[in-house]
Amino acid sequence: CIKERKLSMKIYVDADACPVVRIVERLAKKHEVLCVLLSDTNHVIDSDYSEVIVVGAGADAVDYKLISLLKKGDICVSQDYGVAAMALSKGCYAIHQSGKWYTNENIDQMLMERHIAKTERRKTKKHHLKGPSKRTIEDDKRFEEAFEKMILKAIAENKDKV
């Protein structure tokens, strides 16, 4: 039973408009890791497996709540580079919905690129850019493979803490 599991690590998901929630839950269940989905009041999320935390609507409310809950060794699933940077600073693992791992080696570059893109949008006044392309089965497979590797690594490194 998962409630009896001694492994203290958890998976936290910034679940607002997150296309990989079900994949995360399936793998969390497979590996007996507790999962917490965070969303704001503008999104309705139901789960038979995960704990669901609903945070009041507001800019970055979910992000701040997620960061406050993270403990060293936990996994954070978010498409927000800022959230990922804060997760890494707490000794957590972080992954983007694309399957790309955020690391201490790549996060500064990603934040810089985000800043440059935002600055360019302000200069050109292009605020309504085309959204991401439609998610494919390959995207889901790529995420699933990368996420499972991350879970296995986190479990192996967290076993020492039990």
Regions found by a protein language model. Name each.
Residues 1-8:
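Short, Lys/Arg-enriched N-terminal segments with co-localized hydrophobic residues
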Residues 10-162:
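Nuclease catalytic cores that cleave nucleic-acid phosphodiester bonds
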